[in-house]
Amino acid sequence: MTQTLGAWGRSYEIIVIDDGSTDDSFAILARLQASDPRLRVIRFRKNFGQTAAFAAGFAHARGRLIATSDGDLQNDPRDIPMMVAKAEEGYDIVCGWRKSRQDAWLSRLLPSKIANAIISRATGVRLHDYGCSLKIFRAEVVKSLRLYGEMHRFLPAIASEMGVTIAEMVVNHRARQHGTSKYGISRTIRVILDLLTVKFLLSYSTRPLQIFGLIGLAMGAAGALVTGYLAYVRLIGEQSIANRPALLFGILLLFSEIGRAHV
């Protein structure tokens, strides 16, 4: 990283997030930081996940353009200069596309292709590789976003609501030499749940009253069903409904819809 950026001739800083590592990573990073003022290390006391790491990096970054990359050495830093050049053409986000991805087909590539197709369809922002961490962002774009869960992978889709311009570029991807991936089925489930959240936000963030309108209609329909049933019980079945909690519940649901209609 330092060799590539140093030869590039541009000013830069490197922010490394130690996401609760259990080996000697932090000790090594601390020694490197002592000898290079451009390196900044942020340490989490426990593992908070990639989204929290991204959020911390965005918050502490001081440059106008921010590059993100995984720590598994599969992303190639030599792609950063060309991606920055693309951003300087006027794009707010430049996304990497690992077209020749060096991962197992069944366990990584196939699920990734399916996930990218689903995310692109659900969000309306079509990218080949949402999971590629190698991206360039304009600082003002990501610093205004609030991230949680597994939402780092949806950044382009979330930011699209701000009217940003997005480009995608083919980048190099190297085979993993050290460690093993922590991605598994539980991670996939969390991603799906967060995708539902993102879809909800993208659908109603600019028209929040519509969701309340839908909720109000549902409540009104439920109230009509409840009171209609109770009316049937009283008139046809000739049973008393005065002491039934459902009567009060149905009336409240109906009045909530009537009140919404007159606001």
Task: Give residue spans per PLM region.
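Histidine kinase transmitter module recognition
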Residues: 4, 8, 17, 86, ...
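Hydrophobic helical membrane-anchoring modules
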Residues: 150, 154-262
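Conserved hydrophobic residues forming the short capping helix/wall of the S-adenosyl-L-methionine
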Residues: 2-5, 29-33, 87
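Acceptor/aglycone-binding surface of glycosyltransferases and processive sugar-polymer synthases
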Residues: 31, 38-60, 65, 77-161, ...
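A conserved acidic beta->alpha catalytic loop
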Residues: 18-27, 73
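Short beta-strand/loop segment that forms part of the nucleotide-sugar
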Residues: 2, 8-21, 42-43
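Short hydrophobic "helix-edge" motifs at membrane interfaces and signal-peptide entry regions
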Residues: 13-14, 61, 128-129, 206, ...
